[in-house]
Amino acid sequence: MTRDTSPDLHYLSGFGNEFASEALPGALPVGQNSPQRAPYGLYAELLSGTAFTMARSELRRTWLYRIRPSALHPRFERLARQPLTAPLGAINPNRLRWSPQPIPAEPTDFIEGWLPMVANAPAQKPAGVSIYIYCANRSMERVFFNADGELLLVPEQGRLRIATELGVMEVGPLEIAVIPRGMKFRVELLDGQARGYIAENHGAPLRIPELGPIGSNGLANPRDFLTPVAHYEEAEGPVQLVQKFLGEHWACELQHSPLDVVAWHGSNVPYKYDLRRFNTIGTVSFDHPDPSIFTVLTSPTSVHGLANMDFVIFPPRWMVAENTFRPPWFHRNLMNEFMGLISGAYDAKAEGFLPGGASLHGVMSAHGPDAETCEKAIAADLAPHKIDNTMAFMFETSQVLRPSQQALECPQLQADYDSCWATLPSTFNPNRR
C-alpha cells in the first residue's frame, strides 16, 4: 500500500494486477465471488471491462461488494442540456493549432465542460478515440459514468479529487488518471477551477507498452501506477446519476449514493500515474530516436504494433547526441497526432504552442520544428544540455482524426499556424557539401 501526498488517501501499487481491497475487515468473501450471503449484507456485482472469453492477459473485470446493486435505479431520461457534441466538421487536411480554451464564466461542472476537439469513430464502434478539452469551475454534485469508452484525463490546470466506485484518488498537473468504461465517479475541484485534456478510448483498454530490446525496466514502470483503496459512501437522499451513452447524456435520480462499494477485487480498476516518474530513454550517441520511446500507455489493435491509441509524453531530458539535428525531425506520418502542452514549452515550437493549447497533424501532414527552432538547432553548440521545465504530450492514433465543428469554428483556432514554417529558407548549394 502506498500513501500519496494527501494524508487521507492510500493507493495500491502496480499495473494490470489482480488487486483486492476492503473498507471493512472481512468484507471480501473468501474462496468465492458470489456467496449466498455476502459479508455485512452486501450485494455481489461483477463489472466487466472485456468479454468473458478474452485471454487472461487481456481480461479486465472486477467484483464489487456494495450496499445496493447498480440495478436499483429508475428509468433514464434524456437531459435537456446536452454536451457539446457537434457533428464532425468538414473534411480538412490542414495542420491545425488552437490557443488555450478559456475557463467558462457561468458555473460549469466537469461533465458540462467538455469541448469536443477531434474524433475518428462513433461511440458505438469498438475502436477509435474521441478527444476533448475540459474546462470547469464547479465541483460535481452528481455522479457520472461513461458507457462510450475508457477515459484518460490529463490535467493542465487545477487539481481533481475523483471519487470512484472503487475509491478516491487525487490528480493534478503532471499526473494522469484513467477511469474504466462504465465506472461511476464524481469530480471535485480542489483549486476552484480546472482545465485539461480527455482521451475517450473506444478500443481495447490501455496498457503499458512492451519494452522489447529496452529490457525489463524503463519508460512507465508498473510499480508507479496507483489504484485507490476501497472507500464507500452510505449517504441517503437524492443523487442524480448521469450516463454518457452514444454521445448523449441521460440521467435518473437515486435515493442513495451509488459510490457505495465496501470491498472489491479484480483488474478493471481506476488508476493514476505521475508523469515525472517516467524513465525517459534516449540516444547517447547520435540521431533522434523515434518518439515511440516516449510511450506511456497504448491501446492496441489486432495488427501487431499498430495502435488504436498511444499516449506519448515529451518530458524533461538530457540532449547529448553528437553531430545531430536535435529537435524532432521533419516528418510525414501514417499516424494521426493530437498534441497538448501541460507546462513549459515544446522543443519543436519556439512560440504559439501554449499550455492548455493543442495541435492536430493528420495522416501525411508534413510537420516538424518551426523556422526559429530549426535555425537555432543547425547553429547550436552541441554541448550536452537539458530540456527542463516542460511536459508536452501526444494522443496518436492509426485512424484519421477529424475536428469537430466547434473546434473549427472556435476563436481559439489559429488562422496563421502555417506561418511558423513560412520562413524556412533554402540553404541548398550544389557547390558546397
Swiss-Prot record:
Superkingdom of origin organism: Bacteria
GO BP field: L-phenylalanine catabolic process; tyrosine catabolic process
Binding positions for homogentisate per the UniProt entry: 346, 367
GO cellular component: cytoplasm
Induction notes from the record: Induced by homogentisate and repressed by HmgR.
Keyword Cell division: no
Pathway terms, separated by semicolons: Amino-acid degradation; L-phenylalanine degradation; acetoacetate and fumarate from L-phenylalanine: step 4/6
Enzyme nomenclature, EC number: 1.13.11.5
Cofactor field: Fe cation
UniProt enzyme class: oxidoreductase
Alphabetic keyword roster: Dioxygenase, Iron, Metal-binding, Oxidoreductase, Phenylalanine catabolism, Tyrosine catabolism
SUPFAM superfamilies recorded: RmlC-like cupins (SSF51182)
Catalytic residue positions: 288
Catalytic activity: homogentisate + O2 = 4-maleylacetoacetate + H(+)
Record note on disruption phenotype: Cells lacking this gene are unable to grow in medium containing phenylalanine or tyrosine as the sole carbon sources, and accumulate homogentisate.
Residues binding Fe cation, per UniProt: 331, 337, 367
Subunit structure: Hexamer; dimer of trimers.
Family according to the record: Belongs to the homogentisate dioxygenase family.
Role of this protein: Involved in the catabolism of homogentisate (2,5-dihydroxyphenylacetate or 2,5-OH-PhAc), a central intermediate in the degradation of phenylalanine and tyrosine. Catalyzes the oxidative ring cleavage of the aromatic ring of 2,5-dihydroxyphenylacetate to yield maleylacetoacetate.
Protein's name in the database: Homogentisate 1,2-dioxygenase
